[in-house]
Amino acid sequence: MDSDSWSDRLASASRRYQLDFLSRSDNFLGFEEIEGEDDFREEYACPFCSDYFDIVSLCCHIDEDHPMDAKNGVCPICAVKVSSDMIAHITLQHANMFKVTRKRKSRRGGAQSMLSILKREFPDGNFQSLFEGTSRAVSSSSASIAADPLLSSFISPMADDFFISESSLCADTSSAKKTLNQSLPERNVEKQSLSAEDHREKLKQSEFVQGILSSMILEDGL
């Protein structure tokens, strides 16, 4: 599969995860209301229909009702003309707005949401191989993460839940594959090894997924 296509699909999955996560944050276990929240909640006019929403609802509204218009408009927060992606601009340039009325106590639930979204984005057989590469990439960076206790406390629970969930979801598939492989003759070692090009593509895909996970973890930890 073309690497650009993988990148587009993963970027789309990441954005859907972030919007889904933010829009349902009130229902996540471990969230606590900050005293006087209603006093700080501001509403902004949608740049495409002039209806008013709080910052999270605005992003969800634009994504659902104005997906085509979102590539060109004026940011309702800073009044800057955006010519690429309005939602990406708001979530990246005004990330602090999402944290004004909330403080985070737990990361529980985030990994499961990301997992389900990626499963929908990759319904074919490529999902499992993608995470095999991601697991190796995360392992290779575990030493540097362990050096920072704060980062480790955020990343470790999410990573454990993420890959344990993936293992349980793929248990039946793995069992079936094992039975099938036992009935087949031994394959040539050369056929089992990936070509250099396949290896590079899988490595690129793994690094991209790791980058998405890391960026979301670091943004939530700020």
UniProtKB/Swiss-Prot annotation:
<feature type="modified residue" description="Phosphoserine">
    <location>
        <position position="116"/>
    </location>
</feature>
<dbReference type="Pfam" id="PF05605">
    <property type="entry name" value="zf-Di19"/>
</dbReference>
<keyword id="KW-0597">Phosphoprotein</keyword>
<protein>
    <recommendedName>
        <fullName>Protein DEHYDRATION-INDUCED 19 homolog 6</fullName>
    </recommendedName>
</protein>
<dbReference type="InterPro" id="IPR027935">
    <property type="entry name" value="Di19_C"/>
</dbReference>
<dbReference type="Pfam" id="PF14571">
    <property type="entry name" value="Di19_C"/>
</dbReference>
<dbReference type="InterPro" id="IPR008598">
    <property type="entry name" value="Di19_Zn-bd"/>
</dbReference>
<comment type="similarity">
    <text>Belongs to the Di19 family.</text>
</comment>
<dbReference type="InterPro" id="IPR033347">
    <property type="entry name" value="DI19"/>
</dbReference>
<keyword id="KW-0539">Nucleus</keyword>
<dbReference type="GO" id="GO:0005634">
    <property type="term" value="C:nucleus"/>
</dbReference>
